[in-house]
UniProtKB/Swiss-Prot annotation:
InterPro entries referenced in this protein's UniProt entry, alphabetically: Kinesin-like_fam (IPR027640), Kinesin_motor_CS (IPR019821), Kinesin_motor_dom (IPR001752), Kinesin_motor_dom_sf (IPR036961), NACK_C (IPR021881), P-loop_NTPase (IPR027417)
Pfam families reported for this sequence: DUF3490, Kinesin
Occurrences of domain Kinesin motor (ranges): 17-341
Gene name for this UniProt entry: KIN7G
Acidic residues: compositionally biased ranges: 613-631
GO CC term, one of those recorded: microtubule
Protein name, as recorded: Kinesin-like protein KIN-7G
Binding site for ATP: G105, Q106, T107, S108, S109, G110, K111, T112
GO MF entries: ATP binding; microtubule binding; microtubule motor activity
Region annotation Disordered: where it falls in the sequence: 600-648, 740-760
Family to which this protein belongs: Belongs to the TRAFAC class myosin-kinesin ATPase superfamily. Kinesin family. KIN-7 subfamily.
Presence of keyword Nucleotide-binding: yes
Top-level taxonomy: Eukaryota, Viridiplantae, Streptophyta, Embryophyta, Tracheophyta
Chain coiled-coil ranges: 350-425, 611-640
One GO process term, biological-process aspect: microtubule-based movement
Amino acid sequence: MGIGEDQMQGSSGREEKIFVSVRLRPLNVRERARNDVADWECINDETVIYRSHLSISERSMYPTAYTFDRVFGPECSTREVYDQGAKEVALSVVSGVHASVFAYGQTSSGKTYTMIGITDYALADIYDYIEKHNEREFILKFSAMEIYNESVRDLLSTDISPLRVLDDPEKGTVVEKLTEETLRDWNHFKELLSICIAQRQIGETALNEVSSRSHQILRLTVESTAREYLAKDKFSTLTATVNFIDLAGSERASQSLSAGTRLKEGGHINRSLLTLGTVIRKLSKGKNGHIPFRDSKLTRILQTSLGGNARTSIICTLSPARVHVEQSRNTLLFASCAKEVTTNAQVNVVMSDKALVRHLQRELAKLESELSSPRQALVVSDTTALLKEKDLQIEKLNKEVFQLAQELERAYSRIEDLQQIIGEAPQQEILSTDSEQTNTNVVLGRQYPKLRVRSSWESLNITPESPLSAQASIMISPQSTEHGSDENVFQLSDLRLNSGASSPAQHLAFVTPGKFTKVRLNIRGVESKNQLHIHKGESVDQSRVQGERLHEMDEPSEVDSEDTCTELQCIETESPGIIMYPEPNILPDRCKAVSALPLCEPESKNSRPPTETAEEKEEKEETEEKEEEEEERVKEVSSVSIQTKEKSGPIKVSPRCVLSLTDESFPDESSNLKRDPTHQDFVTPSPEKLYAWHLESNGQTAGGTGFTRSRSCGASFVSSSSFSLSERDANTPPCWYQNERAESNLKPSNSKRPPLPKHISRMSMPATWFEKDFNHTQRMPAGLDGVNMIKSSPNGSQVSTSKSHVYARQTSGRALISQDEGEETVPQRDKRIIHLSMEEIEQKFLALRSSKSFKDAAVDPIQDYLTMPLNWPLEFKRLEMEIIELWHACNVSLSHRSYFFLLFRGDQKDCLYMEVELRRLKYIRETFTHNNKAIENGRTLTSMSSLRALNRERYKLSQLMQKKLTKEERENVFLRWGIGLNTKHRRLQLAHRLWSESKDMDHVRESASVVGKLMGFVDMDLASKEMFGLNFSLRPRAKKSSLWKRSVLSLSIL
């Protein structure tokens, strides 16, 4: 039997009616003994008639002749019944079509006798077909069940527990945990069939000595696959099922004389057969109304066979005896209804990849032919609905446009209000032909409402040779001192960064009211080399500023002040250079003389930069030549060869930055600074800022302090409040530490917290420096070694608590840090303690990097900074176990644990993050041990609050399981974690088992995998470790996160 490709596809199927046949058995021994008369007779192969003994009036109530697809008389054998009534349907299974064969009738009418023979003949023919078609490989699977008292039981199993009937979206109705045996040969089938006969429920009644008391369903699944890919019609896997259903017979209790158990069994049998008859009757009238398939287990299991994707044959058995006339007539009525039921059988194909490709190619060719042929005009029956839909869409879009316009208007009014508050009237935009300038102004104006773009840059075009003019041009006006502590003024003038052309200097002024530190950036494009000159001006006299009170200007700026960052992105060219000039000190009288000059004076819209004279052009050329000479001298001193490619490119941004600095000293002013360690106007920035001081050895006074950047470099300017706070946090110990430090200098014998010995070199730290106990926070941080600490006394005078020391002992350069100390609160102290370890790490990095070349620092800064143990994998495992135990003790968020565990997998560069996490956890544990409160990211943490947060997170994870995982995935996870599928609150059980064992690494790894899947973590190999937040949690982060920004910036510099 060949199976064509089109037939196997069966996409639409074919409709056909159920094949109904009637088998009339002869009178049995009991009926002949009672001298019963046969009232039914087969007059031909399709008609059965009733030889009525009733009167003419009674005959008119019932039909006397019934016509079906095939009628078998008493002389017909079971072989004939199979060949002409069931063979074609049963053998459809080898063609990939589902099939079902029913035996329906009253009790003792011969149903079981008929179905046993049909089952044997069908299996024999299937095996004969398999032997004749060696080109395909066949797999036969056999299962059997019975429905006894509306309970489904497995006939191939000794377990009599009932089975559940489930609905599968692909397979339809299935029986859970039903045994399915793969047949080896014919003998194996006969053995299984004998087991089914022995397991089936039977009983004796007055009508039948061996009466079936249950409905039996024998199911055979046939799968066939082509052995070789030889022809287009032999490429797919066919899967189909044939059911042999032997129904229990309907009976009357008055005739069967049943009682007790037999009466109960008969009631269930009649009820299920009544539901079957109702389903058949409604299907015969069409499938429009409700079909009660779920009213009985029998109809629910056979739903596909009765009116779905299957070919069905029903054999109705009759008893000719007059005593059973009414039961026989009901059977014929059932058969008449079943004859009108239509099924839609389809070929069930599991297509292989090659077959799927061919099918798609054929579909593609069909679609291409349709496209190539001229399209027929589409007739739109009703255009009113389409027009209404379009009108609604237009109205919706108009509303959105109106709302966006209102939001834009409010945004512009907000900008104008802010400009009026800071004392600068709104300026109208000046139309410019330069598209880059226009785009920059628009973007900066929307993202930074306090950012004012100057239309002229000539007033700030100051070269390093004119420090007085530079200082005068950026002095703070009295009006600017009225800004709040969170207010920052950032000026950007004419941001036209043309890397290939030589253009006048472009300046940016950044003002922080806390210390009124000015940083001016001169962005120059000199031929093919872009150099960024940073001039750090002098501070305004502190005595003049202390008299003026800084107040808050508006509430929104106070909330967002710590989060506001103005980032200066690096200009990626082939060979960028950045030169930093610490300008000489200016005497207080000079400061007073120029302090009246305003910082940012509004310019009229008609102002234009003056035309350059010949003298100015010559001065610029001389300045550029001097700068090139200084750059060459710096390259020779540092022994760094910077290869340049004469190429001009666009501005690009990259998140990482490596800075290396050399020294440029000014003989007079720098010496004054070194002699005066308490000078207020010279502040060395902390490592979190965009530069780091690196002083060359031998005390030489070289030209230009320069540092080189990598091609991907990003630096950040923080706002005023966060700038001053970060500077204080980076270099200032807690107030209790200062007091005891001062006491230790005065009374060494009474000191309880001895500071770190100053004669110990930073390079002599042990390789396992991360093993140092973080609990001893009373020791002096490494970041404070060699720092002048100035403490304010009650009368306003300043007392120096230590002498100046060399900052990095590997070099002979000097960097002095001077800052004001003020009173701090307990939350500020807690925040600082966490970051002292970070400061120590960063200071070590700066100290160690000074002994490396620029090339080494740029290529692998982390390896230069870290002194790795000899066996890092073992050390990583030890640190990992310690961190996991601390996570468990401190009730750390499960999402943070999982993200950290999956992200850091033992790379040598991960030791920095392991150390930071370890110290943070030790601090939290120490705080919880003393029943104190820890402050992290602006939140107060206690042992109980962290435990409550952990329980809330577990509850949220249990909710995510319902959304993120399918039912099958959830069941697999429950089984893998030892949670029974029949238990309650399975998701909560799993959530509370996650991360519950801190010493079992398999448990930890599996917990991290589950949480990662629920939280939707991306591939950890692609994640940016530099930007990883050590406080990662389910809850949204608070707005004020300047403390975290400092940590992220520090890690990005590394």
